[in-house]
From Swiss-Prot:
<dbReference type="InterPro" id="IPR052464">
    <property type="entry name" value="Synovial_Prolif_Regulator"/>
</dbReference>
<comment type="function">
    <text>Plays a role in promoting cell proliferation in response to pro-inflammatory stimuli.</text>
</comment>
<keyword id="KW-0539">Nucleus</keyword>
<dbReference type="InterPro" id="IPR016024">
    <property type="entry name" value="ARM-type_fold"/>
</dbReference>
<feature type="region of interest" description="Disordered">
    <location>
        <begin position="1"/>
        <end position="21"/>
    </location>
</feature>
<comment type="similarity">
    <text>Belongs to the SAAL1 family.</text>
</comment>
<dbReference type="GO" id="GO:0005634">
    <property type="term" value="C:nucleus"/>
</dbReference>
<protein>
    <recommendedName>
        <fullName>Protein saal1</fullName>
    </recommendedName>
</protein>
Length: 462
């Protein structure tokens, strides 16, 4: 079954007076009988364990259809409250614990996820200790739809401020949560699941920096050169950063929205020194991460033939990618990495800044029609500009005569791009601009004179 069937309409059957749930058309008796059938079916499967009459995982088609209806109806608040009053969390816990059918487990978790959209049922689900433990165990399940619904349930609960802390503490105390999420990111090809896991990590890391640091700290631990034990074989490669990168690669062509989520997770890591260390101190020194972000920036985002307004659409992912690369670049420069590998970024960053200038011309802040949404967009565009300028200033300050000559020969350093850089970097980054103009003067005196002549006031300090 590819999708859940719609709930029965009011014409399907006439419920006795007083049998309806609140103001809905849904029958209490129907729910009672459906949940009773569910309990009986699971109990019967349990009693027949070891017999070969039925293949494991089979579910009666009619019962599946009925449970799907419960799943759909549970999005209604009155139904969710009724299910809570009927002790549905306890019932569904028993079903999940006994079920050998992945589809049934998926549906039960989906019902709980829908109920969690409402505060009172969410609190009942979140404070149920045994249910919480079982749900955490489901992250090791091999069934992608079950994993998707489990991740959705966690994400929904984290959006409820009254119970979010309960779940964060559960995640913190159970090391298997981190390992299972890393395993999903590193091995799954299910786009919806990867996106949902990314959303879950994004919410968790944004809510609790201590949890984020705890989960990435092992990435920074010294690597043992001795042989690992059999139990360590699986855990050894599951580093948070490499798993995030693997998921991002999977989503690059499949889900731009999902890719943006993972880039924001990486950006969250760079807000702490431990996070930056986890990125740059991976076994390859962060080369895979750098190469992926470099290729993404130079070949996918904000291309020369794109309309300037593309930055409106890409402002989120651009801000995250450039922020991560900027943090990595500083470390790479300190470690003596050659700046020549970063020359294509001058073209990309200049393109971003030029497009931002065009956007400001077409959408001036003084526009009287500007509303909250426009102000929100403008603030994000300003963030993108700030990130781009800081990154570009870092690159320009590291250029030597030889690297400038190479940049000119490859077409990355042109008069137009240099003028764009000076317009945006001065006066805040005057020191970096001065260092850059000195290198340009050694490589191409004519270009340096032109740049100083066209920006005399701003370049005075240089």
């Amino acid at each position: 079954m590819d999708r859940n069937p719609s709930p029965p309409s009011s014409d399907d059957e006439s419920a006795p007076e007083g049998d309806c749930i609140g103001d809905t058309i849904y029958s209490k008796h129907w729910f009672f009988s459906t949940l009773t059938r569910l309990i009986e079916a699971v109990s019967e499967d349990k009693s027949q364990e070891g017999q070969e009459d039925e293949a494991p995982g089979d579910l009666d088609e009619e019962l599946e259809d009925e449970i799907c209806k419960v799943w759909d109806m549970s999005m209604n608040e009155e139904v969710a409250l009724f299910l809570q009053g009927f002790n549905a969390p306890e019932i569904l816990l028993g079903v999940i614990a006994k079920s050998k059918c992945s589809r049934l487990t998926e549906m039960c978790v989906g019902i709980l996820g829908n109920m969690s959209c409402f505060l009172e049922p969410c609190m009942a689900i979140s404070t149920h200790q045994s249910l919480g433990e079982v749900l955490l165990l489901l992250l090791s399940d091999a069934d992608p739809p079950t994993l998707l619904e489990t991740s959705r349930l966690f994400l929904t609960c984290l959006s409820q401020a009254d119970v979010a802390g309960t779940w964060v503490e559960r995640f913190r105390k159970d090391p298997s949560v981190r390992e299972n999420l890393c395993f999903i990111m590193s091995s799954s090809t299910n786009v919806d699941l990867l996106v949902k896991v990314g959303e879950l990590l994004d919410r968790l890391f944004d809510m609790d920096e201590d949890l984020m640091l705890a989960w990435i700290r092992s990435d920074c631990a010294p690597r043992e050169t001795s042989a690992v034990t059999e139990n360590e074989d699986r855990a050894a490669p599951l580093e948070m950063v490499s798993c995030l990168l693997e998921a991002a690669k999977q989503l690059r062509s499949e889900s731009p929205e999902g890719l943006e989520i993972y880039m924001h997770v990486l950006q969250l890591l760079t807000t702490a020194d431990t996070g930056i260390q986890a990125i740059v101190q991976s076994p390859d020194g962060g080369e895979q991460t750098w190469d992926f972000l470099l290729d993404l920036t130079c070949n996918d985002l904000c291309q020369p033939n794109d309309p300037p307004l593309i930055v409106q659409e890409q402002k989120g992912i651009l801000s995250s990618v450039l922020a991560v690369m900027s943090a990595m670049f500083v470390w790479r420069a300190e470690q003596g990495h050659k700046v020549e590998k970063s020359l294509p970024l001058i073209s990309s960053l200049a393109q971003v800044l030029e497009n931002l200038e065009e956007c400001r011309k077409k959408c001036p802040e003084s526009d009287a029609r500007e509303g909250p949404d426009a102000r929100h967009d403008n603030s994000h565009l300003q963030i993108l500009k700030d990130v781009s300028c800081e990154f570009l200033s870092n690159i320009l300050s590291e250029l030597s005569k030889d690297s400038v000559l190479q940049g000119i020969s490859l077409g990355h350093i042109t008069e137009r791009r240099c003028q764009c850089a000076l317009r945006n970097l001065l006066p805040l980054y005057s020191t970096s601009v001065g260092t850059f103009l000195a290198a340009v003067g050694e490589a191409d005196r004519s270009l340096a004179d032109t740049l100083r002549r066209e920006t005399p006031v701003r370049a005075e300090q240089t």
